[in-house]
Amino acid sequence: DCTMRIGVDLGGTNVRAGLVKDGRIVRLLSEPCKADRPEGEVVDQIASLIGKLITPDVARIGIGVPSVVDAARGIVYNVVGIPSWREVYLKDLLEKRFGVPVYVNNDCNCFALGVSRFGEASAYSDVVCVALGTGVGAGIVIGGELYCGHDTGAGEIGSIPYLDRDYEYYCSSRFFVGRGTTGKEAYERALAGDPAALALWHEFGGHIGRLVMMILDRK
């Protein structure tokens, strides 16, 4: 099979696009997402990255987005970190531009499927992948098949109540912002041995541990 694929990871911070052959990324592009811009400008940004990668051998395009998705129709709803993206017919828009099939799903689902097929979890049939970033979510593979639930939202664990808020507040970048810093800044301070930053990461790790315990349902 000489065909190639393009994978796109859309986030509120960055947009990444990779040209993939035989399960391996042969070229990767990344740039800051125009998250505060109108809907069409963000679509154009994605299309621009795809346009730099596409060749006649590209058979299909896959896109992961941080939101619930009507996967059958490729409609994206209420994307985290991109206020203008409330209802975007992403599949139709990109298929018209490039003339190849476009598949859209929740980014955590894409993450879980990739790890279970090509990554560290390829030897396992049941997998839960937790993604941490601007928010927190999970992708679920059961019996080797991706489990999406309704509107691809089966792994939307961030909104589950936890302490006085929810898991997303304590297990994402919001945790650091709520304490007057950022994950990157706290990381750099911790590397330098700052006791306050080390304590902050210790607390953050505790919240992640409780999230994992909740997923595993251990006694």
Feature roles, as predicted:
Residues 33-35, 84-85, 154-156:
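A short acidic/small-residue loop/turn micro-motif
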Residues 67-71, 110-112, 137:
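Short, active-site-adjacent cap segments at secondary-structure transitions
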Residues 122-174:
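Glycine-rich phosphate-binding loop of actin/hexokinase-like ATP-binding domains
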Residues 74-87:
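A charged helix-plus-loop insertion that forms the helical arch/lid used to bind
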Residues 102-107:
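General beta-strand structural signal in soluble alpha/beta enzymes
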Residues 1-61, 69-75, 91-100, 115-126, ...:
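ATP-binding/phosphotransfer module of carbohydrate and carboxylate kinases, centering on a glycine-rich
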Residues 15, 64-65, 135-136:
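Short loop/turn microsegments at loop-to-beta-strand junctions
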Residues 28-30, 79, 149:
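Residue-level detector of high-confidence beta-strand sites
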